[in-house]
From Swiss-Prot:
One annotated Gene Ontology cellular component of this protein: host cell cytoplasm
Keyword Ligase: no
Keyword tags: ATP-binding, Coiled coil, DNA-binding, Host cytoplasm, Nucleotide-binding, Viral genome packaging, Viral release from host cell
Assembly and interaction partners: Heterotrimer of two small and one large terminase subunits. The active complex may be composed of five heterotrimers.
Cell location: Host cytoplasm
Protein name as catalogued: Terminase, small subunit
Gene3D superfamilies: Winged helix-like DNA-binding domain superfamily/Winged helix DNA-binding domain
Matches recorded under Pfam families: Phage_Nu1
Recorded coiled-coil stretches: 51-105
GO molecular function, one term: ATP binding
InterPro entries from the UniProt entry: DNA-bd_dom_put_sf, Phage_lambda_Nu1_terminase-ssu, WH-like_DNA-bd_sf
Length: 182
């Protein structure tokens, strides 16, 4: 929905001057105004920008708190003390937020989702491969049955590998981590 500055201020329950300040901080504008012409904002883009801004501010607060706790010297923190527990909680919150941001940005993908996608792709590939011998036979009627059998055998092997792809993801992840660590 496209709105002017006054309406956007009402949506966020802030003063229109706050919207102007946000513009200087990067609030996206659907069309910039000029003398006598109002600026127009896309509410979806504005809400997304605001949410990201708030997330960044919260992350910065958590990082600062974490740095303050580290400055207090991690070695001074004794398990069971309130400072130690606060440090653990803050660190866990910061890590969780960074992981959430990475997931939202598409940098991190859950293994279950990746496995599901890989299995779907493998099924589609297998479906195409199974039709290859019939396509060859129709396109080249003179092809010998022994040649078709060889093609069918190789396609069956490839289809079996594709079918097991979802089962192999865990092992492949371990292989990747070992290779990445070396």
């Amino acid at each position: 929905m496209k709105v002017n500055k006054k309406r956007l201020a009402e949506i966020f329950n802030v003063d229109p001057r706050t919207i102007e300040r946000w513009q200087s901080q990067g609030l996206p504008c659907a069309s910039k105004g000029s003398k006598g012409i109002e600026s127009v904002f896309d509410t979806a883009m504005a809400i997304q920008w605001y949410a990201q801004r708030e997330t960044d501010i919260e992350n910065e607060k958590l990082r600062k708190e974490l740095d303050d706790l580290r400055a207090a010297a991690e070695s001074d923190l004794q398990p069971g003390t309130i400072d130690y527990e606060r440090y653990r909680l803050t660190k866990a919150q910061a890590d969780a937020q960074e992981l959430k941001n990475a997931r939202e940005d598409g940098v991190v993908l859950e293994t279950e989702l990746f496995t599901f996608i890989l299995q779907r792709v493998a099924q589609e590939i297998s479906g195409i491969l199974v039709r290859v011998p019939l396509t060859l036979q129709r396109k080249y009627p003179d092809i010998s049955p022994s040649h078709l059998d060889v093609v069918k055998t190789e396609i069956a092997k490839a289809s079996n590998v594709a079918a097991k792809a979802g089962e192999n993801v865990g092992g492949w992840i371990d292989d990747f981590r070992r290779a990445e660590g070396s």
